[in-house]
């Protein structure tokens, strides 16, 4: 029992000492202001947060205007609660942070779009490579080889390129183009044969007669072009130096007499 009484007396003495120490403290200068500066009201009353009251308050007022009014609370009290809410300050800070990120992302996206559009407008067209100008000797040798060999082996390709002073790519390209040209020519010939088969016999005869007339006309034109050349050579034939002048004069007189005789006979 004595130990319990001693413990009670020691606890009461400690409480009395604490009370005496609190009584000795000076009273606060402003009793209305709370002692802790970390209360919600102190945070909301800071000047940095007051600036956001207008934006956040208007946003809350607009959102609250869509909702039905709560029962038992007037409009002024609801507006004050929305302005002094700690969620408003948190929302404002978050909106500022995300707003900066959104602006940077949008600017980057706009810059990319502008660069892509600008690049698409000014992308130069790919210039086609200039075609290789082969010499007559090179074309002759290539055509001669193409007559009996349409496809070249690597060894043959190297041999032709070295022989004609060309590159392997040029030889390959020439043979590819030549095979394509041969294929087109064969297709055109097949189309011509099929079209002639579909034609009537009378149309075929008409085509043949037209071709024969064209050939005969060309032959006549050639003969006419040759005849004046022969007349010019006969008229301008040089006289032999061995022929005397008297013989020439006599021949002229005989020709004149013959012409006169021919005229008389004609009459």
From Swiss-Prot:
Keywords: Developmental protein, Differentiation, DNA-binding, Homeobox, Myogenesis, Nucleus, Transcription, Transcription regulation. Coiled coil: none annotated. Residues 1-21 have a biased composition (Basic and acidic residues). One of its GO terms (biological process) is muscle organ development. CDD domains: homeodomain. It is found in: Nucleus. Residues 255-267 have a biased composition (Acidic residues). Its main location: nucleus. Residues 127-186 bind DNA. GO terms for molecular function: DNA-binding transcription factor activity; DNA-binding transcription factor activity, RNA polymerase II-specific; sequence-specific double-stranded DNA binding. Residues 1-36, 211-267 are annotated as: Disordered. Residues 228-237 have a biased composition (Polar residues). The keyword Transcription regulation applies. InterPro entries: HD (IPR001356), Homeobox_CS (IPR017970), Homeodomain-like_sf (IPR009057), HTH_motif (IPR000047), LBX_TF (IPR051892). Expressed in all myoblasts that will populate body wall muscles as well as in a group of cells the migrate into the head. Gene3D superfamilies: Homeodomain-like. GO terms for cellular component: nucleus; transcription regulator complex. Transcription factor that controls hypaxial muscle development by down-regulating myod1 and cdkn1b/p27, thereby allowing myoblasts to proliferate before the onset of terminal differentiation. This is Transcription factor LBX1. It comes from Xenopus laevis. The gene is lbx1.
